[in-house]
Amino acid sequence: MLKMGVVLFIFLVLFPLATLQLDADQPVERYAKNKQLFNPHKRRGIILRAPGKRCCHWNWCDHLCSCCGS
């Protein structure tokens, strides 16, 4: 009877606990949530730097940069 109790305990308690997905096992979702908290102006700066364009004052806008708006 003791062996059957141990087997039941393993399959009914320990096995389901080992197969649960914890929040810490999902780093992609946490990273996406953290990225949404960026200031919109910071995101714009990151996006502008990606293609290599600069952000210029609205008086100095030309084909080498894009206007910042302020």
Swiss-Prot record:
InterPro entries: Conotoxin. Coiled coil: none annotated. Disulfide bonds join C55-C67, C56-C68, C61-C65. Residues 25-54 form a propeptide. Expressed by the venom duct. Keywords: Cleavage on pair of basic residues, Disulfide bond, Secreted, Signal, Toxin. GO terms for cellular component: extracellular region. Pfam families: Conotoxin. Residues 1-24 form the signal peptide. It is found in: Secreted. GO terms for molecular function: ion channel inhibitor activity; toxin activity. Belongs to the conotoxin M superfamily. The cysteine framework is III (CC-C-C-CC). Classified in the M-1 branch, since 1 residue stands between the fourth and the fifth cysteine residues. Shows a very weak inhibition on Nav1.4 and Nav1.8 sodium channels. In vitro, inhibits proliferation of the mice ovarian cancer cells ID8. This is Conotoxin Mr3.8. The lineage of its organism: Eukaryota, Metazoa, Spiralia, Lophotrochozoa, Mollusca.
